[in-house]
């Protein structure tokens, strides 16, 4: 049976206390709504999102990554609430999966289990450790009797710890029949989607409760819950990669972006941050290093190194306090305290301490190209654009602003001068 998916993302998100819409808050370097959409499109080709607050901003983010998403707009002024969000929604398939845009931890396998039940109305529920302000689910004879919103629950109903996760699977025809019957006769004067349970019961529809994991189905409403959710996601990411053979030393101290990939035998030490679409292949990343959108193959990086975006390292050693950006390094050694930006450096080359590629003139950036088996002495500056051919020696303390031919020695120090007894003349009273 084919399924249409509707994601509710029209809320104001005031508890997040941010100018950024709630569903655009990031977990592991990806917006909440994008986490949900990835799982939704894995299950269906008919996916819609309901927006309202900062609609244009959220819509732009969604369509940039998932251009086939259908965007709907909720009239919050006249039809507030979760049922109000469904006005104008026309599913293409026989049933509808309704999700919340602030549930980025939900796994595809859990949604598949929910869809595996053939009841006309299924809802995800969980046993809450702390029921807080969740809607309470009253279950009787293996079926759902009703859902009571916290604001409308009496003292006895508030003692129930079976709570509504806010995720539903409903027959499309049943939804079309019952949705117009939902009113706003409640404390909040909102149109509650939960009322569809009561209406379905009145028509003797069997309603099935599917128990799910509370942590996985948590809704994120503020920055504290955002941090909790990101910790959960980090644990999942690192657990997955450890099961694939990656070694993490003190994994709780490292941050791995959701789009990062590891290949082969890799080792990651404490306090490392790897983000973007970085790919680490058979490499060691040592303590307190940062890697952003870069490829590292058969190399070791760090400690205390920084690979900014668009670096590609192969068979290379990058030591402490070395920063690279937009750098292609093949079998290179850069042991310490250097900046290598907008450059290509070939095999066998050694970069001395304090080397800088001066790539920016205040308007435009330029490239430094260094060939094979070049020895670069300490405290060297390359004034780009500049090309150093193979088997060149650059003397320590050089400022290189011209191309250097193969096999040459480059040196441009000024002559030295020694003034005897100068110290005593300057400081003697």
From Swiss-Prot:
Region (Pyrophosphorylase): 1-223
Catalytic residues, chain numbering: 336 (proton acceptor)
Residues at which Mg(2+) binds: 102, 221
Chemical reaction(s) catalysed: alpha-D-glucosamine 1-phosphate + acetyl-CoA = N-acetyl-alpha-D-glucosamine 1-phosphate + CoA + H(+); N-acetyl-alpha-D-glucosamine 1-phosphate + UTP + H(+) = UDP-N-acetyl-alpha-D-glucosamine + diphosphate
Keywords for this protein: Acyltransferase, Cell shape, Cell wall biogenesis/degradation, Cytoplasm, Magnesium, Metal-binding, Multifunctional enzyme, Nucleotidyltransferase, Peptidoglycan synthesis, Repeat, Transferase
Binding site for acetyl-CoA: 359-360, 378, 396, 413
EC number: 2.7.7.23, 2.3.1.157
Cellular component GO terms held in the UniProt record: cytoplasm; membrane
Residues that, per the record, bind UDP-N-acetyl-alpha-D-glucosamine: 8-11, 22, 74, 81-82, 135, 149, 164, 221, 308, 325, 339, 350
UniProt cross-references to SUPFAM superfamilies, sorted A to Z: Nucleotide-diphospho-sugar transferases, Trimeric LpxA-like enzymes
InterPro entries linked: Bifunctional_GlmU, GlmU-like, Hexapep, MobA-like_NTP_Trfase, Nucleotide-diphossugar_trans, Trimer_LpxA-like_sf
Region (Linker): 224-244
Subcellular location, principal: cytoplasm
Record HAMAP family: GlmU
UniProt similarity note: In the N-terminal section; belongs to the N-acetylglucosamine-1-phosphate uridyltransferase family. In the C-terminal section; belongs to the transferase hexapeptide repeat family.
Protein name as annotated: Bifunctional protein GlmU
Provenance organism: Campylobacter jejuni subsp. doylei (strain ATCC BAA-1458 / RM4099 / 269.97)
Lineage: Bacteria, Pseudomonadati, Campylobacterota, Epsilonproteobacteria, Campylobacterales
Protein's gene: glmU
């Amino acid at each position: 049976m084919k399924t249409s998916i509707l994601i509710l993302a029209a809320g104001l998100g005031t508890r997040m206390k941010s100018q950024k819409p709630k569903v655009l808050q990031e977990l592991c370097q990806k917006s909440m709504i994008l986490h949900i959409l990835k799982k939704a499109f894995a299950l269906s080709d008919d996916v819609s999102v309901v927006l309202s607050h900062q609609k244009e901003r959220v819509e732009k983010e969604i369509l940039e990554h998932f251009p086939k998403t259908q965007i709907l707009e909720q009239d919050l002024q006249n039809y507030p609430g979760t049922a109000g969000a469904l006005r104008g929604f026309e599913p293409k398939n026989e049933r509808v999966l309704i999700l919340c845009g602030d549930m980025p931890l939900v796994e595809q396998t859990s949604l598949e289990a929910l869809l595996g039940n053939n009841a006309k109305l299924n809802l995800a529920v969980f046993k809450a450790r702390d029921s807080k302000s969740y809607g309470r689910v009253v279950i009787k004879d293996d079926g759902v009797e009703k859902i009571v919103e916290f604001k409308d629950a009496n003292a006895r109903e508030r003692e129930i710890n079976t709570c509504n996760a806010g995720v539903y699977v409903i027959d499309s025809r049943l939804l079309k029949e019952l949705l117009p019957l939902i009113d706003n006769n409640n404390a909040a004067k909102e149109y509650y989607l939960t009322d569809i349970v009561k209406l379905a019961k009145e028509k003797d529809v069997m309603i099935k409760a599917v128990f799910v994991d509370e942590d996985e189905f948590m809704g994120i409403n503020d920055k504290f819950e955002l941090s909790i959710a990101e910790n959960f996601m980090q644990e999942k990411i690192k657990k997955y990669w450890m099961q694939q053979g990656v070694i993490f030393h003190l994994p709780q101290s490292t941050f791995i972006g959701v789009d990062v990939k590891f290949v082969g035998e890799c080792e990651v030490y404490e306090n490392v941050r790897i983000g973007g679409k970085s790919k680490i292949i058979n490499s060691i990343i040592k303590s307190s290093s940062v890697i952003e959108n870069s490829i590292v193959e058969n190399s070791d990086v760090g400690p205390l190194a920084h690979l900014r975006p668009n670096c590609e390292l192969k068979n290379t050693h990058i030591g402490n306090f070395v920063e690279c950006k937009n750098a292609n390094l093949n079998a290179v050694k850069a042991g310490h305290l250097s900046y290598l930006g907008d450059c290509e450096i070939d095999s066998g080359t050694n970069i001395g301490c304090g080397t800088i590629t001066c790539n920016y003139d205040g308007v435009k950036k330029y490239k430094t190209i260094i060939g094979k088996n070049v020895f670069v002495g300490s405290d060297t500056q390359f004034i780009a654009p500049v090309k150093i051919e193979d088997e060149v020696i650059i003397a320590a303390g050089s400022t290189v602003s011209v191309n250097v031919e193969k096999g040459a020695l480059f040196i441009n120090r000024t002559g030295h001068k020694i003034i005897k007894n100068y110290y005593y003349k300057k400081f003697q009273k």
